[in-house]
Amino acid sequence: FWGAAAKMLGKALPGLISMFQKN
C-alpha cells in the first residue's frame, strides 16, 4: 500500500510544485 502511495505522491508532487511556482 505504502509503495503505491509513495508512487502517487512522487507523480503528484512535481505538478503541485510547478503549479505553486507559476502563481
UniProtKB/Swiss-Prot annotation:
Keywords from UniProt, A to Z, are: Membrane, Secreted, Target cell membrane, Target membrane
Q: What superkingdom does the record give?
A: Eukaryota
> In its keyword annotation, does this UniProt entry include NADP?
no
Q: In which tissues is it expressed?
A: Expressed by the venom gland.
Main location (coarse class): secreted
The record's subcellular locations are: Secreted; Target cell membrane
Q: What is an example of a Pfam family matching this protein? A: Antimicrobial_4
Task: Name a biological process GO annotation.
Answer: defense response to other organism
Any one cellular component term from GO for this entry?
Answer: membrane
List the InterPro entries hit by this protein, alphabetically. Antimicrobial_4
Q: Describe the family membership recorded for this protein in Swiss-Prot or TrEMBL.
A: Belongs to the non-disulfide-bridged peptide (NDBP) superfamily. Medium-length antimicrobial peptide (group 3) family. Ponericin-W subfamily.
Q: What does this protein do?
A: Membrane-perturbating peptide with multiple activities. It is insecticidal, since it induces contractile paralysis in insects (L.cuprina) during several hours, and death after 24 hours. It shows antibacterial activity with higher activity against Gram-positive than Gram-negative bacteria. It is also antiparasitic, since it potently inhibits the larval development of the major pathogenic nematode of ruminants (H.contortus, IC(50)=5.1 uM), but fails to reduce the motility of adult males of the other nematode B.malayi.
What protein does this entry describe? M-poneritoxin-Nc1a
